Amino acid sequence: MHAGEAVQQLKKAFETVASFDFRDALSKASTPVTVVATNGPFGLAGLTCSAVCSVCDRPPTVLLCINRKSYAAGIIKSNGVLSVNWLAAGQAVISQTFAGVGSVPMEERFADKGWQTIATGAPYRMDAAVSFDCTIANIVDVGSHSVIFAEVVARNHAEECTPLIYHRRQYATTRSLAE
């Protein structure tokens, strides 16, 4: 077997890992629970997003990955602004609502007074562990998802809170090892 055949066999082996095995492996990694929201000329929308992380602090930038087929994806990209809200321990219902559980209409998802705006007009959750108000800096499409790079223009955070995380396909919280 020559090197080209070996590379092709490796590629094929990795392709078989894809969908189910990939998602199953990632379910064992804990992730913060976030809701991404937008409002602007193209409408009001939001979704629960598990793929969010920091990129750099100069300029302060985060990235998030959203399925291009989701209702909110096109609205978020068209508005050009968004908020990223890392939820606190008692906010699993908010996560479920924005994930589509219960088929709550989009406008009703934002009906309670916990949603406000800072700079861009994108709604942020006042009682979230952390909320960033952002403008979209870049979008890269990869497979089924859009990777959105968003520059942070304002922030809000709770003084004391326990974050909500998702681990092994269920909600959980963190606990300090020093206790």
Swiss-Prot record:
Residues annotated to bind FAD: 48-51, 65-71, 99, 104-109, 144, 166
Keyword field contains Lipid metabolism: no
Enzyme Commission numbers on file: 1.5.1.37
Pathway connected to this protein: Xenobiotic degradation
Binding site for NAD(+): 54-57, 145, 166-169
UniProt xrefs under Pfam families: Flavin_Reduct
Reaction it catalyzes: FADH2 + NAD(+) = FAD + NADH + 2 H(+)
GO biological process: pyrimidine nucleobase catabolic process
Keyword RNA-binding recorded: no
Key words of the record: Aromatic hydrocarbons catabolism, FAD, Flavoprotein, Monooxygenase, NAD, Nucleotide-binding, Oxidoreductase
Single annotated GO MF: protein homodimerization activity
Alphabetized InterPro entries for the sequence: Flavin_Rdtase-like_dom, NADH-dep_flavin_reductase, Split_barrel_FMN-bd
Subunit structure: Homodimer. The chlorophenol-4-monooxygenase is composed of an oxygenase component TftD and a reductase component TftC.
Protein family (similarity comment): Belongs to the non-flavoprotein flavin reductase family.
Function of the molecule: Reductase component of a two-component system that degrades 2,4,5-trichlorophenol. TftC provides the FADH(2) required by TftD. TftD oxidizes 2,4,5-trichlorophenol (2,4,5-TCP) to 2,5-dichloro-p-benzoquinone, which is chemically reduced to 2,5-dichloro-p-hydroquinone (2,5-DiCHQ). Then, TftD oxidizes the latter to 5-chloro-2-hydroxy-p-benzoquinone.
Record protein name field: NADH:FAD oxidoreductase
